[in-house]
């Protein structure tokens, strides 16, 4: 799993990861942190966390304009690529549409399945992002509490 936010701040991601573990899957989660002391690997309730240091600008501002600014994707491609070169995975599971490009890149480069799990309502972005209007994604989830 790849999450552009800090963890365990997102309860939905935690519940999903724990459900996958309960079903017999090994779950790794690559996520951002703004605190140097949290950088590195940790086991959290069976979830193998891989935290990478982000800057406040990248974390708060760049993701707003990520569809226009390539350095946001470059940062995440580097992090995902580093993890995929050291670990073996069958699937890359991206949380939220802004990182869909990174998931598609990993699918092509590393030959793994790509799951996009959108926790937010991004209908206005669906027309803009070719990754959601094609067969480039193997599975697309959208889980909203309310519509």
What are these regions (language model features)?
Residues 78-82, 105-109, 122, 136-147:
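Membrane-proximal helix-turn-helix segments that form the acceptor-binding/catalytic region
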Residues 10, 37, 73, 89-126:
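An aromatic- and histidine-rich active-site surface loop
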Residues 1-48:
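N-terminal subdomain of nucleotide-sugar transferases
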Residues 44-49, 110-111, 132-135:
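Short, hinge-like loop/turn segments at secondary-structure boundaries
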Residues 83-89:
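Glycine-rich phosphate-binding loop signature in dinucleotide/nucleotide-binding domains
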Residues 58-60, 123-128:
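Short acidic/His/Gly/Ser-rich catalytic and metal-binding motifs that mark active-site loops
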Residues 50-78, 133-139:
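A short, charged, and often flexible helix/loop element on the N-terminal side
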